[in-house]
């Protein structure tokens, strides 16, 4: 993926960058693999905001992605590489030899016309999916399951990959993109390679309106709100927050307070915390 830099024709184009989309080969998605995506704008079923700073954004169709890769020992051909508005990674359309079509996350260096396969007997080639126990040490993997047969849940963002560090007993040790080192059961499937579109993190948004297209609303500081809206609010002019330490809109300690639940079951599988 290459990045295109705009000239400063307007303040909105100054320093603005976009993807050139050179790897995209098909502009229209497969009709059998799309569905409507009702956007809730951060509201729950009662209309109350439960996730702040989320707006409507541009209308999108949801592409059904195969995170399970459960068509074992059936070869599939990569037909096209497409844009997905719901994620920063690209997606690849597969045509299986039995006639079924599925989308998967597009791994880096996987080209059109190549074949991929899933299963214990799969070779160690980019795009193939197999259990962690059958993947050698040092291999880069993505779309990793946390529980067997549940489907890939971690390492799915553009440009990310995890590395297999060790194998012992019923578990495989993985180093994640966050530098966290954790144990995962050896029966869990993972896909060989790194997720494509590695320059996604280098994109410069350029203007506020582009963030609104992406369903992101402005994040207003609590100190400039009214007292009824935030504990930091109120006062005359530029006044301090009036508290010994920052707090959330609901009065709980913020900035430096760890938010992960202590009695979480998965703590036993984390060997080194993320940094």
UniProtKB/Swiss-Prot annotation:
GO terms under cellular component: chloroplast; mitochondrial large ribosomal subunit
Regions of compositional bias (Basic residues) in chain numbering: 255-275
Keyword terms of this UniProt record: Chloroplast, Plastid, Ribonucleoprotein, Ribosomal protein
GO biological process entries: mitochondrial translation
Chain positions covered by the region annotation Disordered: 36-56, 224-275
Location within or outside the cell: Plastid, Chloroplast
SMART domains to which the protein is assigned, alphabetical: Ribosomal_L2, Ribosomal_L2_C
Molecular function via GO: rRNA binding; structural constituent of ribosome; transferase activity
Pfam families on file: Ribosomal_L2, Ribosomal_L2_C
Domain of life (superkingdom): Eukaryota
Listed PANTHER family: LARGE RIBOSOMAL SUBUNIT PROTEIN UL2M, RIBOSOMAL PROTEIN L2
Assembly and interaction partners: Part of the 50S ribosomal subunit.
Recorded family membership: Belongs to the universal ribosomal protein uL2 family.
Name of protein: Large ribosomal subunit protein uL2c
Annotated organism of origin: Gracilaria tenuistipitata var. liui (Red alga)
Gene: rpl2
